[in-house]
Amino acid sequence: MQNILNKIYQSQHLNKEESYRLFKSISSGSITDITLSSILTAMKIRGESKEEIIGAILAFSECVKYFPKPNYVFLDIVGTGGDIKNTINISTASAFVAASCGLKIVKHCNQGVSSTSGSADLLKRFHINLHASSKEHRKTLDKLNICFLFAPKYHDSFKYSNNVRKILKTRTIFNLLGPFLNPAIPPLALIGVYKKDLLYSSIEILKSLKYQRAIVLHGDGTDEVTLHNTTHVAELFNGKIFSYELHPKDFGLKIHDKKIFTKTSLEENYYIINQIMKGKGDKLNEELIAANVAILFKIFGYEDLKSNTKLALNKIRSGDVYKHIINVANMLKED
């Protein structure tokens, strides 16, 4: 193990096998907090390689408590976080809109570590019981098209790194692992990454994990579609990888001069999204969520982004999404 640590401290990349060994030790709690802190910091400064990410994924995947997989097609929408923008939870809001439109979504979620509030923090604010049994969550997926898999419940091995991550308060390789460790093993995925450099390595990882179709995107410094600038996309389709750019006009939308609102607290995040889901949100955030939902439809095979965006906007402005959220919360109510 010391040889592996020395390589990291000398700014050398690990191969897949070395990374697997390292993260196997981390997942079993064999690495002290001080050592783990130095590992994560050193890897962050020099940048994590694709081989290191795959090795870590393989190590943690051996510890996952798997979710009962449906026999129908479903998708995960997730961002790496760590873009330091403190934007509202677009992916969580988009998941609810997509489910209201009939798409099957199994969202892997967690509490905020490198952001003001993670998806799990927001979901709890909407009174969604993340600690319900897998059977109950599967029921909401079957009947209401959506369920949320709370990472700590399915990834017990992450507990050994949580304290260090909270102390560091910055993005680390763990931001890159979550999107590839959904306990339901979805065949489809939309992943937002915090920097453009991660696009190609992320889509290659999805290909190696045998995803049927997936899109990885980065927009204007965020891990979401942007309506302020160019969205950079890497897509996996029929075993081939494509790279392209998207602009607001591709969604039938105009460029927004102002950038997306940022939130300073969980309560502000909740209030903004609550209003949007009730059909009372501001135009920018409505359109931003609709554009992300349009990408979800595309992954499911509905290729017309403009039609997809229009459908999503109509659903958002109807207020039906909020009713859908309430139905999900009621189905998962604690006795």
Curated annotation (Swiss-Prot):
It is an enzyme of class 2 (transferase). InterPro entries: Anthranilate_Pribosyl_Tfrase, Glycosyl_Trfase_fam3, Glycosyl_Trfase_fam3_N_dom, Glycosyl_Trfase_fam3_N_dom_sf, Nuc_phospho_transferase. Anthranilate 1 binds at residues 79, 110. Its EC number is 2.4.2.18. Binds 2 magnesium ions per monomer. GO terms for cellular component: cytosol. Mg(2+) 1 binds at residues 91, 224. It catalyses: N-(5-phospho-beta-D-ribosyl)anthranilate + diphosphate = 5-phospho-alpha-D-ribose 1-diphosphate + anthranilate. Its cofactor is Mg(2+). Pfam families: Glycos_trans_3N, Glycos_transf_3. It comes from the Bacteria. Anthranilate 2 binds at residue 165. GO terms for biological process: L-tryptophan biosynthetic process. Pathway: Amino-acid biosynthesis; L-tryptophan biosynthesis; L-tryptophan from chorismate: step 2/5. GO terms for molecular function: anthranilate phosphoribosyltransferase activity; magnesium ion binding. Keywords: Amino-acid biosynthesis, Aromatic amino acid biosynthesis, Glycosyltransferase, Magnesium, Metal-binding, Transferase, Tryptophan biosynthesis. Mg(2+) 2 binds at residues 223-224. 5-phospho-alpha-D-ribose 1-diphosphate binds at residues 79, 82-83, 87, 89-92, 107-115, 119. NCBIfam families: trpD. Homodimer. Belongs to the anthranilate phosphoribosyltransferase family. Catalyzes the transfer of the phosphoribosyl group of 5-phosphorylribose-1-pyrophosphate (PRPP) to anthranilate to yield N-(5'-phosphoribosyl)-anthranilate (PRA). This is Anthranilate phosphoribosyltransferase. It comes from Buchnera aphidicola subsp. Diuraphis noxia.
